[in-house]
């Protein structure tokens, strides 16, 4: 068979009638240590290029690495939280390959003796069912530098006039978490992939080992996808999709790659084993480099580092430091708040649990906090194309908005305008209200009564209906008053005044 381009991607439902998707997820997590994996260079995000480097992370001759103990501790805690076995004897290995963002021409990683093996993570799908994802391994390694390709239309090396290299990230501690083969998901494969990355992110956040900012690259997901013809016994050729930088993108990338591979196979071609880059703009994947095998990397034990041999006592001590893990916390919160499985599922799917908890801790009621994060703020996140937690508003600021509503200074409609100003960087809600007094709820009874009288005079037929006992007709008058006051009136008080005026 020859490699051919697909004439077009297949309809997703058609794919499922012919092929069974098989997945494997690789998630790289930058650990939140103060220094790099093998040297004392800082790990601050956003520093000037090439200002956080030294002879060790630049691979200068004669420099020797020293293992970051805090990174090893974080890796063990991750393994324990993933129900893994922690190795009593692990070694680092050199992964040999040439690429400009790897200054040593090899990466210090772990190969056949990783820190953690044989675990699992139970994830919740959209309908509330649980899917168990088996973990093959979690291993420690150092991150690479960053390449910036200049002059091309796509930001990739193809077509670029030149490339710039920033080695600040080179040597930052990583834990790579690799799943076993995920099969049997069928049409839900993209959903399972997204749910897994969501659950893993929440777990890592609860451990406080990383800020897991996908938008900043501190959590990066690679999705390995292949298709098996239904009834076949042999696995298909896999591709590895990279550059998947959001939870939504995980699902979109897996779905697209399934459709693309199916089209290639239906056209009589063969899927090439390669890396592919996810294109956020249109939800497609583009070909990268041919995918190497483990043999191509010529792994061998790192001669400059001793094995990592955590004692059983130390491992148990670290087990005792694990916090309340997400699934335990969810059960407790659901009981404490008295919410349904459906509401809890919405909170999980939106990634809003921590945000709601923090908002309640800042003074808002659980009901108000949930309402804001699951409704208006979720809409704003979708509009801006960011994750909910990346919105430029804090739980404390949301709690301030709730307090302003409870005090009667704002109504729900105007409160949304205040939130918009906060999202635009105009300060805390109290500062926004001070700068925009027109947003404060109108409390002058004389003005409100005048507006009510004017609306009733303009609608005598509705006034007659209200006088005859059809109180529901007051809604039209209330709406006119709200329009006249530009939404600043308290709708409940306006309705009271309308009924009083017609009695």
Swiss-Prot record:
It is an enzyme of class 6 (ligase). GO terms for molecular function: asparaginyl-tRNA synthase (glutamine-hydrolyzing) activity; ATP binding; glutaminyl-tRNA synthase (glutamine-hydrolyzing) activity. Keywords: ATP-binding, Ligase, Nucleotide-binding, Protein biosynthesis. GO terms for biological process: glutaminyl-tRNAGln biosynthesis via transamidation; translation. It holds the Pfam family GatB_N. It catalyses: L-glutamyl-tRNA(Gln) + L-glutamine + ATP + H2O = L-glutaminyl-tRNA(Gln) + L-glutamate + ADP + phosphate + H(+); L-aspartyl-tRNA(Asn) + L-glutamine + ATP + H2O = L-asparaginyl-tRNA(Asn) + L-glutamate + ADP + phosphate + 2 H(+). Its EC number is 6.3.5.-. InterPro entries: Asn/Gln-tRNA_amidoTrfase_suB/E, Asn/Gln-tRNA_Trfase_suB/E_cat, Asn/Gln_amidotransferase, Asn/Gln_tRNA_amidoTrase-B-like, GatB, GatB_Yqey_C_2, Gln_synth/guanido_kin_cat_dom. PANTHER family: GLUTAMYL-TRNA GLN AMIDOTRANSFERASE SUBUNIT B MITOCHONDRIAL AND PROKARYOTIC PET112-RELATED, GLUTAMYL-TRNA(GLN) AMIDOTRANSFERASE SUBUNIT B, MITOCHONDRIAL. Allows the formation of correctly charged Asn-tRNA(Asn) or Gln-tRNA(Gln) through the transamidation of misacylated Asp-tRNA(Asn) or Glu-tRNA(Gln) in organisms which lack either or both of asparaginyl-tRNA or glutaminyl-tRNA synthetases. The reaction takes place in the presence of glutamine and ATP through an activated phospho-Asp-tRNA(Asn) or phospho-Glu-tRNA(Gln). Belongs to the GatB/GatE family. GatB subfamily. HAMAP family: GatB. Heterotrimer of A, B and C subunits. This is Aspartyl/glutamyl-tRNA(Asn/Gln) amidotransferase subunit B. It comes from Rhodococcus erythropolis (strain PR4 / NBRC 100887).
